[in-house]
A protein has these predicted regions:
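Short, solvent-exposed coil/turn segments at beta-strand boundaries
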Residues: 37-41, 66-70, 134, 154-161, ...
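N-terminal targeting signals for Sec/Tat export/insertion, comprising classic cleavable signal peptides
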Residues: 30-55
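Bacterial N-terminal signal peptides that target proteins for export
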Residues: 1-8
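Solvent-exposed coil/turn segments that connect beta secondary-structure elements
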Residues: 32, 67, 78, 144-146, ...
Length: 209
């Protein structure tokens, strides 16, 4: 039986109540434009994300831990993809304006592939998904140590968001972390879409010969 949207909302609400009692708060980040319920302030790491087509994009990882459960949000900024690809110098990218756009459009699938290819991982759920009407992909995996990972991957305003909640064996599924994730606009306000959102590519800026 498929769960209706009202039933799903009720489940999220019921799951959120004990988390609030455990000291969870709504973490808001206006730099990377997201909000998520989390156990306190995260540890933040600046990263370089290696893309499918050999480009390096700036990003940050936000990490939390509570007991034997780990949570993270990875945000990768693809908005400057055209310039980054133009500086690669590889013959495959010279004069080829399509590669930077492909790198953005394929970013969700590529991130999902990285999870599927982890050593010892068994994928138990692998399907299209959306949160706040922003389209993406959902994965559930059993890891080599029998822990369980619940992963959501979304692309919004040319930022890639990878949500990962990993719980040890026999721990409760930490699905509230993903299901209550939200996106913010440039002014820090929650985005609300009436229709499903599909990422729009940034306009080309570089002159072509």
């Amino acid at each position: 039986m498929r769960m209706t949207s009202s039933m799903a909302a009720l489940c999220v609400l019921l799951l959120a109540q004990p988390l609030l009692a455990q000291g969870w708060t709504e973490y808001e980040n206006r730099v990377d434009r997201f909000t998520v319920p989390a156990p306190g302030e995260p540890k933040v790491e600046t990263i370089t994300w290696d893309s499918e087509y050999g480009a390096k994009f700036p990003g940050r990882v936000y990490r939390w831990e509570q007991g034997r459960t780990r949570y993270s949000v990875t945000v990768v900024d693809y908005s400057d993809a055209e310039r980054i690809h133009s500086e690669l110098g590889h013959i495959a990218y010279q004069g080829g304006p399509g590669y930077w756009t492909i790198d953005i459009m394929a970013s969700i699938d590529y991130a999902a592939m990285l999870y599927r290819q982890k050593p010892g991982v068994k994928v138990t759920y692998d399907a299209w998904h959306y949160i706040e009407r922003v389209t993406g992909h959902e994965l559930q995996l059993t890891n080599s140590d029998d822990s369980r990972s619940y992963v959501g991957i979304y692309l919004h305003e040319n930022r890639l968001y990878v949500l990962d909640a990993t719980a040890a064996r026999n721990e409760a599924p930490p699905i509230i972390f993903q299901q209550s994730f939200g996106f913010l606009d440039a002014e820090g306000k929650p985005v609300q879409y009436r229709d499903f959102y599909f990422n729009r590519l940034p306009p080309p800026r570089l002159k072509r010969p």
